Amino acid sequence: MKNLISVHDVENIHHLLEQALMFKREPLAERSLGSGKKLGLLFMNPSLRTRVSTQIAASNLGMECYVLNVGADNWPLEFREGAIMDGSNVEHIRDAAPVMGGYFDLIGVRTFPSLRDRTLDYSEHVIHSLMKYGGRPVLSLETATVHPLQSLADLMTIREFLPEGRRPKIAMTWAPHVKPIAQCVANSFSEWICAWGQADFVVAQPEGFELNESFLCGARVTYDQKEALEGADFVYMKNWCSYRDYGRVHGSAHEWMMTLDHLKLTNQAKLLHSLPVRRNVEVSDEIMDHQDCLAKNQAAN
């Protein structure tokens, strides 16, 4: 595996999942695997769980890890080809990436979408520029369209709580939010669940908030949240802004906030959220504090 950008870079998702669970049980099992290697983590946006967990994972493998916060620890970067750099961006990725490639054996990058220019965001120009000019394997720590490490942690959590002897139903339900939120977590979760192929998967959202079909991989889609929740064994709660009317926030959809009344429709479902969460906007306090909420398990994975 040269790069890990999405589930499409994973040769065998079942093997990867078992390996990840093994490392959870025995975190120092391959302490010398990364000996002598250096991992550079390039953060263009805030991060808590991805940042810390990746640093810990690198340490457990014996790697040295270096964190760079773009615009804070190092110069603001320019990614446009042919740009006349007379603005606030000081260094071009064509110059910075080869330098980082000389320092590091592996480069991780985290970047958010603009949520203004769909074509540019979905081209994944940031991570592709790093892959093009860095000369090193690249690890996605979240990009404009996907979040593979989050999805792997999600799948690990589901695997740990699978009901015995039957195929589970997994519902991903849209949740309200006060500002535009990227589609990357929802896109990625859909891709990974469909690639895993061990569950009946349904996505529920209001009209106008359909995800890009290329990420749904044939998953069932409904505008009826109650229908999606009916009999679900797992419920993934997540906001995303409109793809069709790119970046738009739903004006009023409080009824989509997950509450105990919604939970009653499920098959005593385990509850998932990638965090951070806007309590009592996306999800009620009672849901986040519920014994079946696995958000902290996801973070640990």
What is each residue range found by the language model?
Residues 4-6, 137-166, 171, 274-301:
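Peripheral docking tails and interdomain loops at the edges
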Residues 215-293:
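Rossmann-like adenosine-cofactor binding region
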Residues 57-59, 66, 126-142, 201-204, ...:
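P-loop/Walker A phosphate-binding loop and immediately adjacent motor/lid segment at beta-alpha junctions
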Residues 32-40, 47-159, 278-279:
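Phosphate/diphosphate ligand-binding glycine-rich loop within oxidoreductases
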